[in-house]
Each structure stands twice: as structure tokens, then as C-alpha cells.
Amino acid sequence: MLPSKVEFLPGETPFIGRAVVTPCYFGYGTTLGNTLRRVLLSSLPGAAVEAFKIKGVQHEFSAIDGVKEDIVQIILNLKQLALKVFVDEPVVLTISKKGPGVVTAADIEKNANVEIASGDAVIATLTANKTFEMEIIAGRGRGYKPAEEKDRQNYDLGTIVIDSLYTPVRDVGYSVEYTRVGDITNFEKLILNIETNGTISPRDAVQQSAQILMDHFAIVLQGAGEEKNEVGQIDESEQPAEEPVTEEVEEAKVKKETKVKKTAAVKKKK
């Protein structure tokens, strides 16, 4: 039996939700739950900060005059930014703010190619009456990409490259409960709890994950079908070869047909 009902329930915020799939055949609740969870956490496309540059800073171990946080803390803050990038190429975002005060994602200058979903996220705290200037490079991707795998030749001198977590899903958990269908009590109900970073809704996240799985299974199904057709086909190389028709063969064939006709005519007269 295939599931006949999928229900999406809202959570405490628009980016926390629950998906309920029922009824599932015995054992398939865990199978579906674990598979969807892995895809949700690893394979959805998203965007993240890939590198940044602060005026007057040469590397991640430098001290920043007039800023409370060190570079390591700023890196951690940048990893928490939730954003959408609408182009394939990396986008450069800029910040220019005079202290004292708090620098947040809302201070990033507007860019038509980027949408900031976490405008209240803190980036740095300015403690002096100085101007803080920063460039943030954001890009699109899937899953997790460490800084070591990025080509540093693509960045200017003084740019600090960081690890990037592109997935828009922050957390996924699932549970399986028994449910009744008629007199049968061992069917299962799958409950998925999903939290995103604000750039995608839980419903869209589940739909994209299911589509990714369907695309992969379609390739497997297509490959299995092609193999089946190949087994049913007859190899032409195994067929007996036709002998070439020569003049002698054609003449013998005509004589045989003529003899048959004469014999039939004689029998008819009798």
C-alpha cells in the first residue's frame, strides 16, 4: 500500500514545520524518513558566504582596531548568515559603517542579485569612532565545502576564505508511529520535523528532496528497462547468414517451378 495522505503542519515560526506521511507499509516509515532526512541535510541547493575582506586586515590572525570581535568570531558570525543568491557567479557585497555600534546583516548594501533573510544577524561590534569597511563574497552551492577545496587564485590578496555550508536546512528529525488501516494495526505514520534557515519553507524543502530522489530513481528505472529490452532482442550476428543468389541457383529454381507446373497439368488432364 502506498501512502495516501501527506499533511504539512506549521511550527512556531514560518521556517519550522512538520510533515506527516501516512499510511506507510510496515518498515517503510523508517526507510522514507531516513532517506528524506539525508537528502534534506546534504543535497538541497543554497547559498553561503565563501570569503570576506576587511580593510586593514591581511589574514585571519590579525587584530582589528576598534572591533570587539576577533577574526575567528567574525567568521563564525558570517557562517550564520542566511541569504539567497540569484545568479550562478559569486556576488560581492559591501559594508561601510561608522562606529561605535553593532554591524548586522541589515547594514549590507542592497544588491539585486542577493536577498538577505537574516537581517538581524550580528557580524561585528564597533567600539571606536572609526569606519568599518568590509567585502563579503557569497555564492551558490550544495552541501558543505571546506576552505581547502576552494581555488584561492580566484580571490584578491588579503581575502580570507572560509568553509561554506550551503544547505538551507538547519535541522531535520523524524519519528515513526503505528497507525490503523481498517483492521490492520501495523501500518506506520512518518513524522518529519524540519527547520530551515529562512530562505526556504519546510514544505518546499520536502518537495525538492522528493524530486531529487525521483530523478535518481528514474535513471535507475530507465537503465533497468534498457537492459530488459537488450535481453529480449535477437543478436543479428547469431542469425544464419543468407547464401548469395547466383545465376546457377536462379536457373535451377526456375526449372524446378516449371517441372512442378507441368506435373500439376498432367494430373489435371487425367
Task: List each language-model region with its residue ranges.
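Protein-protein interaction/assembly regions in multi-subunit complexes
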Residues: 1-270
